[in-house]
Amino acid sequence: METTSIELGGVLIQAPVTSGTNLLLAVQCAVYSARLRTDAEPRPRLWAGFFAMMSLATLAGVLKHGLRDTLPDGAFLGVLWISSVTGGVSTYYAQLATIRSHARDATALLLSRAALVQLVVFLAASVGLGPEMTLLIADTAIGLLPVIWFEARGCPEGGWVAVGLAVSIGTAAVYIARLSVGPWLNHIDIAHALMGVSFLLIARGARAAAPRQEGVPWS
């Protein structure tokens, strides 16, 4: 893949479009997190945690792509760790938001513990293997595919979340196919645009707390 760069204030910024779209995503997620955090209901507050983690992950992406040849090796590794760990924790928050919305107390407790076990396994595997993207993708798929299914069935608001998460996971196809318009709009940039749409949809569905009703999937 052909690399691009610009110089800002004497600092060489590599992949400026990729870094810039990461920054926009970080701001977008931070705004959603701040808005949802003020809600009294647990569902939007947990989705606020999801967006807070995604804001940190995408902010780390600014450094990972923009300063990858400028940062010292130790600092760059730290950025990779932040990006990976926050991505895993964001999946955990998404799981909790769905569990607390659609499951009753005993089931919710059991599923919450299962989600915590998944997070611990992911973190332990990351310590052993390092911040591997393949590991993060696997953890995300295992955690979010059930979330998509239950959000789609649980309440009207959950449909927005389900579609948003499906779009987010669908960006993997863009990465695999390496869909690109050119060096200044590569497959990562296109994936970032789709992620922006994904976050918009998730935020719309997260604003309203889903009631626990008889007959919902996890009752």
Can you name each region flagged by the protein language model?
Residues M1-M54, V62-S219:
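Polytopic alpha-helical membrane-helix bundles and their juxtamembrane interface segments
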Residues L59:
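Conserved phosphate-interacting/catalytic interface
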